[in-house]
Amino acid sequence: MKNINKEQIPFIIMAIVAVLWVFYFPYFSKEFLTEYFYMPFLGVIAATVANTTPAAAGIVYFPILTRLEVQPVTAVQFTLIIQAYGMGLGTFKWYLVNKRLFIFNVIPICLLGGIIGVVVSIVFFPIEKPELLTLIFNFIAFLLTQIIFFSILYEHKYPKLGIDLNTINILILFGFSLLGGLVSGWIGFGIDTMFYFILTVIFRINPAVAIVTSISLMAALSIAGTILNIIFHDVPLSIWYSALPGVTIAGLFLAAYLAVKLGPKNVLMLFTMLLSIDFFVTLWTQNTIPISYTVRSFITYALIIYLVYIHVKIFKQGFTEIGSSLGEFKADS
């Protein structure tokens, strides 16, 4: 064991997972081959998104699975269990890449608030139809993406790498984590996106550090939510099993590699694009709020024109790096 270096560990984990996946294939083969054969490919995309941006895998899984006639409650339960695994792997890989990307002192406080929120939302106040809450969350997240756009356009500085845990800061972190835990228990994701904006907007934390820390928090909270679902509700193991190959590859290898290569600016642009697309898809397909086709089309196309304008303006600005203010994902030396 002493001769194993940290570069070999992901390959060992992947080999173990591959053996176990093949071993359990007879138990899940029918569902995998007839219903969920696409999940490994979707898992690659979702896990890459979840482990490179502050948008959890649920932002990919939830709208797609519900359109494929998976019940929303089942989609939420699946989202938590696959994030517990995939973002857990991603957190471990990021720790191997550069442990200085984590703000360790805030995680216990935020995890406590998040777990309390998850317990309340899953155990005491579960909701059967999370579509409206998803729409509201996506709308708020879309509004918050404007902060990222203007921070890039005006080259805002994010000088801090840590947070002083005084009373006010603890209350802010705990309060928003509690709210994020409630949302995550209901729709399967949310605390990571919320936590990222709190770190960058309120505390001026480097985005690279904020992204990785938010990933670790969502991973830990997904584990807690999954345990609660196992105890009080159901866990869709067949869908989870089907997604494992793609999630393993992305979590252990692809996500961190892409983040390092893309850099913080491009990762943030990817993040804003994903949140925007998710909002558009949710708005266009939702039936919770009655909106006419004309109004829906006008809102969607107006927002698309606005986003195209913003992106063109950013790219015309011509800088490929935003200095050290956004931090770096590069490996720890």
Feature map (PLM): residue ranges:
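Hydrophobic transmembrane alpha-helices of secondary-active solute transporters
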Residues: A46-A50, G180-G185, L217, L221, ...
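Short helix-coil transition sites and intra-membrane helix breaks within transmembrane domains
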Residues: T48-I59, S184-D192
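Juxtamembrane transmembrane-helix boundary motif
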Residues: M1-I45, T66-L68, P72-V73, L96-G181, ...
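Interfacial segments of multi-pass membrane proteins
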Residues: Y61-T74, D192-V209, L228
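Membrane-interface helix-cap regions at the ends of transmembrane helices
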Residues: G86-R100, A220-P236, Q286-N287
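Juxtamembrane transmembrane-helix termini in multi-pass membrane transport proteins
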Residues: G58-L101
